[in-house]
Amino acid sequence: MKQSLVAIFCLIAISLSAQSWDIFTPVNGALHNYGGTSTAAGEYVVGLLREDDDFLKGHIVFIDKEGNYKLKTFLNDKYNTMLCGAIGFENGNALVVGGMNWAGEGKERSILLVMVVNPDLDVITEHRYEIDESLDHISSTAYLEYDENGDIILALQCGIMNNSVFEGVPYMCKLDTEGNLLKTKCIDEDLGISGRDITGMTMVPNSNQILLFASGLFYGANLGACYLDEDFNVLNKYLTHRGIFRYYSNFWIDNEHFIASTIETEDVGPYNIYDVTLYEVDKEFNYYNTLVLHRADTSTVTAQITSIVPINENYMYVAGFKPVFNSNVISDIVVWIVDKNLNVHGAKTLARDNSYNYLLGCQGTTEEGGVILYGHSKLLDNTEMMSIWKLIPEDFGLSLSVNEVAQDNSKTAVYPNPTNEVINIPVRDLKGNYSISIWDMSGIKYFDMSVDKEGEELSVDVSSL
């Protein structure tokens, strides 16, 4: 990294704008499930587009380091083409995976599509694998990581129709860097319950073990995790946390502890509240530090952490989206800089006015120590677009910290970029003590207060401080 991370702590940045590019605006189309990867040449973003009365089309966008982009569409006759993941090579090329799902007459069949592409989006090699003739669908969810031998581990979400009900079927694959399929295994029976969705994967440091997260383990829709060996045999299974229905991890503190993001439910009166939380977790799923990045209200728009991108061994970008307070149609994309002890050192909101913005993913870091994000915006007139942002540490501004102490549990919620606005903080029905502070990236507090309230909201007019 050319730029020292000292800049994160010594610069007060309140209203700097990030670089951004709108890629395309399909008036009658909907963008879905983009994944991507960083390479030496730039960023690959892959996904799919649904247009009215048309097949699903796979898309690859390549963005170079200056923000210039190329777009290529992949459509295979009578197949819905769903590109869902990519992993980069040192030479600037990338391996892209996706599903080709039959949309014509006759028996349905699903094919795993594997391509190696270059920055000009030329297809260097292409492979098509029918990994299981019983599959009805290869979904738009895939996680790719390198193992210790340099091969590529692919966790792929597939599915079958069972009595008109779609059931998720998790598959594990191993590929070489030319896209040859070396090994594949359905791990559904090993896990014991069908109908799961894969929600995350990470390689365990200094081993060829795989840590896989999936819903549906043990008890219906609750979330679980399992360790797999290099032959995709299940070693250990864990029920990670009741009430959590998303899980993602990509930051190992050491060989035994990692940072994971979750969305978890909490019953508050007649509502289910969805909190976005970071945890420090060990390999046996004991929980340590906790950081609530978004304290949800009763909105029907669910907040979510989409990506954790390591900056170095001590710091990470944590990116996701959250609803605007008390709204079920408007949401913002948010990026935080967080250290391994779960302290927040900066935050940035990316939003279009009066639109539903959600983050599809992010990659990094750039030569300046920054991060590339790609998101989807749906305007109130139903126009949809994909946008790409480039952030560097100087783009990050003030943050509002709310520390809640209730029923012997202490959690810290962070509200980014509160300058010149009133922050409304929902207070739970449970009585709690709150301390509120605002600081800059050098750690200087501007404001501090303690509150003891019950069953209402706190309002802080940041512009008057």
Provide a role label for each language-model segment.
Residues 15-16, 77, 430, 453:
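Residues in and immediately flanking transmembrane alpha helices
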Residues 10, 16, 217-219, 422:
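Compositionally biased non-globular segments, especially hydrophobic aliphatic-rich helices
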Residues 11, 124, 182, 288, ...:
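Residue-level signal for pocket-adjacent positions within structured domains
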Residues 5, 11-13, 96, 203, ...:
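Detector for intrinsically disordered, low-structure N-terminal pre-sequences
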